[in-house]
Amino acid sequence: VGYGVYDVYDLGEFDQKGSIKTKYGSKDEYLDAIIALKQAGIESYADIVLNHKMGADALQTIPATKVDWSNHNIETSQRENVKVATKFTFPGRKHKYSDFEWNWTDFDGIDYNNQTGENAIFKFVDKKWGAEVDEEFGNFDYLMGADLDFSNPRVVKECKDWGRWYLDLTKVDGFRLDAVKH
């Protein structure tokens, strides 16, 4: 929930990250609100962020290069190993709804090296920023957190599977996709 997305399958149902409810309430309260809107003749649209993830369950050490904050196409360092928050296992959900676990290969960059405490944009070696994005900052694929790599077919499939699950469960009328220019 919000811009710091952790588990898109958790609508306030699982004990994760110190809470069950989201900041907006429980899964049942959310579904009841959608039903009430429909009964009042009001369409409902889910505000979704599929650009990045935050709050990983484990760290991974991977090769990356730093890129310039003002132009993400310019690499500013040699290849180095960075310890990054890219392993998402969702232990509180215990694979309910999806057994997909995210790892560094599902992302193309991140903004923090947990080993050194350095804040920088780290592009993962052998990864490319997305092509169909805003040209602000040279290439505005990277925004924050662990940036999803939509050139990875497994990422695309998981996002589509999640979308079908979400629509089937919530019966919302559609989505407002946030951060799509990234």
Regions found by a protein language model. Name each.
Residues V1-W165, L169-T170:
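Substrate-binding/active-site clefts of carbohydrate-active enzymes
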Residues T22-K23, V180-H182:
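Acidic-and-aromatic substrate-binding clefts and catalytic sites of carbohydrate-active enzymes
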Residues G174-V180:
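Short catalytic-loop micro-motif centered on adjacent basic/acidic residues
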